[in-house]
Structures are given as C-alpha cells and as structure tokens.
Amino acid sequence: MYGKIEKIHFVGIGGIGMSGIAEVLLNLGYKVSGSDLKQSDTTDRLASLGGEIRFGHGRENVADVDVVVTSTAVRDDNPEVVEAKRRMIPVIPRAEMLAELMRMKYGIAIAGTHGKTTTTSMVATVLTHGGIDPTIVIGGKLNTLGTNAKLGQGQFLVAEADESDGSFLKLSPTIAVVTNIDADHLDFYTGGIEQIKDTFVDFINKIPFYGLAVLCLEDRNIAEILPRVKKRFVTYGLSSQADIRATHIRLEGGTTSFVAHYKGYRMGEVSFSMPGAHNVLNALACIAVAMELDVPFSQIQEGFATFGGVGRRFQVKGEVNGITVVDDYGHHPAEIRATLAAGKSGWPERRLVVAFQPHRFSRTRELFAEFVTCFYDADVLVLTDIYPAGEAPIEGVSAERLAEEIRKHGQRDVTYVADREALPEHLLTIVQPGDIVLTLGAGNIWQSGEAFLAKLEEARQA
C-alpha cells in the first residue's frame, strides 16, 4: 500500500473474516487498531501481536487512523463509521482491504456458497507442505496453525472470496476456485439464483489471461454457466467427464480416502482426517490448485495426511462416557444435509443427536421449505431460537414454527427449546452412551455444546 497509510482500524475486529486480514497487516508491520463488543481468544491474539484493541464502539477510536475497514455486519450508523466519514477518513469494506493484500501477491481465491473455509484450509495446508509458503487468510481457525491467518514468504496468497454481498468482485485473483453455486443471501440477491450465477460468472472472468478457474462439475449451476466462462478452466468432480475426479471413496469414522485421477490417469490415493463425501470434492479442488502450481503428487498426498481440519467444521470438541460432542458451522439446508450425511456415513451405528440454531430470520424465511426436509439423517433433533445476526424479527418466522413443520413432514423426534442456555440441561435428559451430539449453526450454538460437554464431565466426576 501507498506509504502514507500507516494505521488501519477495523470495526468488528474480532470477527473471523476481519481478524485474519488484521493479523496479516500486523505481520507486515502496519499499525492496526480495532474495536469489538466483547473480548475473545481472537482479540487476545491480535493484542499479543501488537494490535490496539478496544471494546465497545466510540467516535474516539478513529481519531488517529488513516483508513477504517468494516464488514457487512457493521451498519452505516455505527459511531466509528459516522466519525470517520465526518473526518473524511476512507471507510472501505473488508473485501477491498483483502483485494489490496492480494495485489501484493498472486491471489488464489476460493469462492462458492458452501465449502469455502474447508477448501481454503486444504489448499493452505497442501501448498505449505509443498514448499509454496503462501500467505493465508481463512474464515475459520486452521487447527494445525491455531489461527486463521499467516504471513508467508512465498508469492501466493490463499483466501476465501465472500459472495454474500457481491464484494468478492473487488478481488482479482490469479486462480479462482468455485465449489458450488446455491441460493443464499437472498436479501442481497433479490434477483434470485440467476443473479447469483451472473455474479459468479463475473468473478470467474476477472482472472487474468494467464490465470486458471477451478470449477466443480458436480454442481448443476456451475455446469450451466460453463459456456459463459471466457478464461482457462479445469473441472473436478465424480463424473468421468471431470478433468480431476475421485473414485473408490471410503468413509470410515473421521477419515476420508479416495483415488484421484487426472484426465484418465490414475495418480494415487489421498486420505485425510475429515468426514463426509462432500469433502472429497473440496479435496479435488485443492488438488487442482496444487497441480497448477507444480506441487508433486507425492507432496500433495503428504500434505493431506497432515491436514488437521478447521474450527467449526465437524470439529470434535470432546468425548465423555461414550458421548461425542461435535460442532459444525452449517446453517444452509445444503450444508446441513452434507454434514448429517457425513456423520451417518462415518459412524452408521451411532445415534445422531442434533441441536440446531437457525441463523438469520431472512434466511429462515427464504429457505423455509428446504429447512423442513433437510434433517432426515438426524435421529433426534432439537431446535432453539433463531440467531438474529443483527436482523429484526420477521412476523411468522420462528424456530418454533420450523420445528412444527419439520414434525409434520415426517421427522419423528423433534423438540423446540426456546432458550439456548437451557439446551445443555435438556440434552442431558435425552442422550445415551454411543451418541454423537452435533451442535449446528453459524451463531453461538457452539457455546451450548461446550456447556453440555462440561456438564457431562461434571456428572462423570460426581
């Protein structure tokens, strides 16, 4: 960045998308400040790296900064945003700052409605093992790093591309991965799936003439836009028509294995510690990126063997008395189906108890019919109230009504517990040894899983 930019302020610095960029900037030597509503492990880490962290939002927080970075969760009437504009300090979206980082490197941007964080984590792990040493900005904590960001010495930057508000169009990556295209964020994409597809086409076609698009042939919407892609691309999937494909898939507990092929040539077996057939596709995307950067297949295999998963993506939190507690970020019906299928395929003999917290009133309304039928792989389902994520309630949209409709559509064991903090006690009354208890959602449902795990431990020691 131009030399006169010295201090960068993040509004909502504790957010998973903001903190990674802030950490990279700190490692680059910039002065970084930020505000958030509460202290967390993330804010503690940034403070330990030299960040100035303040809790609560106030006009005084932007008095001496050169630029203010905001996420989509920050409203225009935020006092720091208002004061920055009054002082004529530039206020930019998170994606614009990520784009600036990407201009310093060759960018590898992973986009798609689902699977971005896992795929980005796989790419980061495999490229690091392959000697590429990329800079990394991920929307989740990579378990082997203990953080969601790292400044690498190599010439590539690996990052997620967030499509939720179209801001990923600010990025100009050299390699663009699209895992899938689905209907989501319909409060922004008022034109529905066709507008979403158009936006992804624009994103793909922004790569330079020497770049590469990596596209999932298993996804119907991606297949439909292929004729509109004007840049070089490779496809991946399970079909024999895909350039990079998987066969002989094995799902055993928390381990996934498959044989990888490139244009009919059998490359070899890949194995990694993360359950679910959907993660085979994520791994194929990673292989495509690594091959483009000439990472030997043997190093790709070794990289996957070291992959330790990512926070809040089928993350095993602990096990007490034969009861395993798992947490997952899934909050869209397609993600929920894939996550529950992963649990069932990996541990077919175990009962799957799911505690789900819907995320956003608007998403619950727009995808209500899909939510009603996406939980059939759950043996026991408990719903708690919707996590608003800053939204106002919408009349007629509630977790209680969703639970009623799920029950009407054939789900046998469905319970509604309004207060999320009451979930741990409720779970204690219904679980039995051998169960997998899965907390599911993009809000704060993970806290209920940790509280439940603590209660199990207390009961064991009593």
Curated annotation (Swiss-Prot):
Molecular function via GO: ATP binding; UDP-N-acetylmuramate-L-alanine ligase activity
UniProt-annotated location(s): Cytoplasm
GO BP, sorted A to Z: cell division; cell wall organization; peptidoglycan biosynthetic process; regulation of cell shape
Chain positions recorded as ATP binding sites: G112, T113, H114, G115, K116, T117, T118
Organism of provenance: Geobacter sulfurreducens (strain ATCC 51573 / DSM 12127 / PCA)
Keyword Cell wall biogenesis/degradation attached: yes
E.C. numbers: 6.3.2.8
Protein's name according to its UniProt entry: UDP-N-acetylmuramate--L-alanine ligase
Pathway: Cell wall biogenesis; peptidoglycan biosynthesis
Lineage: superkingdom: Bacteria
Reaction(s) the record says it catalyses: UDP-N-acetyl-alpha-D-muramate + L-alanine + ATP = UDP-N-acetyl-alpha-D-muramoyl-L-alanine + ADP + phosphate + H(+)
Listed PANTHER family: UDP-N-ACETYLMURAMATE--L-ALANINE LIGASE (PTHR43445:SF3), UDP-N-ACETYLMURAMATE--L-ALANINE LIGASE-RELATED (PTHR43445)
Function in brief: Cell wall formation.
Family membership noted in the UniProt record: Belongs to the MurCDEF family.
GO cellular component, one term: cytoplasm
Keyword terms of this UniProt record: ATP-binding, Cell cycle, Cell division, Cell shape, Cell wall biogenesis/degradation, Cytoplasm, Ligase, Nucleotide-binding, Peptidoglycan synthesis
